[in-house]
Amino acid sequence: MDSQRTLLVLLLALVSFLLFQQWQVAKNPAPQAVEQAQTSSTLPAPSFADELDPAPAQQASAKLITVTTDVLTLSIDTVGGDVVAADLNQYSAELNSANAFELLRDTQGHQFIAQSGLVGPQGIDLSSNNRPSYQVSADSFTLADDQNELRIPMTYQANGLEYTKTFILKRGSYAIDVEFDVINKSGNNATLGMYAHLRQNLMDAGGSITMPTYRGGAYSTEDTRYKKYSFEDMQDRNLSLTLTNGQGWAAMIQHYFAAAWIPRNEPGANLYTRVIGNMGDIGVRMPNKTVADGDSAHFTATLWAGPKLQDQMAEVAPNLDLVVDYGWLWFIAKPLHWLLSVIQSFVGNWGVAIICLTFIVRGAMYPLTKAQYTSMAKMRMLQPKLQAMRERIGDDRQRMSQEMMELYKKEKVNPLGGCLPLILQMPIFIALYWALMESVELRHSPFILWIHDLSAQDPYFILPLLMGGSMFLIQKMSPTTVTDPMQQKIMTFMPVMFTFFFLWFPSGLVLYWLVSNIVTLIQQSLIYKALEKKGLHTK
């Protein structure tokens, strides 16, 4: 019994520490800016990098055009046709703020933009100081109520070639198709290819002091479904991977939101990263195409700029939904998230959905919980016999072990019976933690009364204090034979430690743990009453 309680304490402490540590340092640590010469001398850049000007864009903007749909508001620079701002219209910057969340922006001290262009012998984006200045028919474009698709063509002519860059946005979608059409009237062959990358400051920290998260790169290939590539990785070496079948993507991700470039039908495309000063690029370079005189060529890629909505992202590209990172227990967390979403669609409140999900999960695990408490009760009933055995045998460990096993066999008690159910439950608890932690749906979602945002900490710490109190009640209800003073101090300190950890946890997670503790109290009462009737428990 003592060993089981000790294991319980250690498991809870370990899980709490690991979750808290992961939550605190999941973000990419702010890296130090590096000189370009150091980067280039350490590892050679991908072969195509020589085509691009090594300096960040310095050319003054000719004009910014505004593109508005029901879910996005974009600012596109007519110089180069870069997306220099992306506001998510249905997500506020802060709770109760009228300002939309800015995913992409190009401001003093912060740059996160989506660039795309044409490189190669006849490319027009080889130099960041001499990029094409596109012509466009209007300063703003808005998706009308009777429209499902909005197209923004931008044109440019040089050296006998006609270039058209078109942005295509659809109602309700965060996926933006970017197409290049090139008509060759130069009298000679023209060779060029498309590139598309995301550029971001390497010094940007992820999240805030109370909600630090990962901010950095990620990619997918035919061989690697999903892999993070942090800013530190980019500084260590330039990424260069070939998409043999053209299936993959490159992304910059952060908590709840992501931007990604996805090539379309481009076997041989190259995923790459490069670091220039304190700026990091991650993107894709499509193979060159040779366009004969009088002929034309078409290039296309898709830009995702929006929240981490798994269903929509899975439709845009294979494995893009994996940016919702549930960790190694994804196969448990993903069904739990699906079930949570289904419940919310009925009850209409994410906090109530968390409560319902907790009751469902704990109810499903009730047989394991009952087996755990029953085994612990049987072990507790054997304590007098085990103590007498220790006094009789003394320090002969081998004999003590043999007689203990004989006693367990005679009494039909499994000494690990109380530990195994607990160990089996832990992955479910951890998976549910990540399902709640990664759900953008909880962002700015209210519960009741003072809880206005389930993704933020409880402003008055009421839920963490209630959670700590529920842990204290569980301890008081649980029989113990622990006599070691150190173990007693550890067990007494556990509710205090948990309460401290949970003070800064998102209130949705604290709500889950509080409700889980309440369910534990209910289940304990029911199980102990049943054990009393069997003579295995006394008040």
From Swiss-Prot:
Belongs to the OXA1/ALB3/YidC family. Type 1 subfamily. PANTHER family: CYTOCHROME C OXIDASE ASSEMBLY PROTEIN COX18, MITOCHONDRIAL, OXA1. Gene3D superfamilies: 2.70.98.90. GO terms for molecular function: membrane insertase activity. GO terms for cellular component: plasma membrane. It is a multi-pass membrane protein. Interacts with the Sec translocase complex via SecD. Specifically interacts with transmembrane segments of nascent integral membrane proteins during membrane integration. HAMAP family: YidC_type1. Keywords: Cell inner membrane, Cell membrane, Chaperone, Membrane, Protein transport, Transmembrane, Transmembrane helix, Transport. It holds the Pfam family YidC_periplas. This is Membrane protein insertase YidC. It comes from Vibrio vulnificus (strain YJ016). Required for the insertion and/or proper folding and/or complex formation of integral membrane proteins into the membrane. Involved in integration of membrane proteins that insert both dependently and independently of the Sec translocase complex, as well as at least some lipoproteins. Aids folding of multispanning membrane proteins. It comes from the Bacteria. The keyword Cell wall biogenesis/degradation does not apply. CDD domains: 5TM_YidC_Alb3, EcYidC-like_peri. The chain crosses the membrane at residues 6-26, 341-361, 416-436, 454-474, 495-515. GO terms for biological process: protein insertion into membrane; protein transport. Its main location: membrane. The gene is yidC. It is found in: Cell inner membrane.
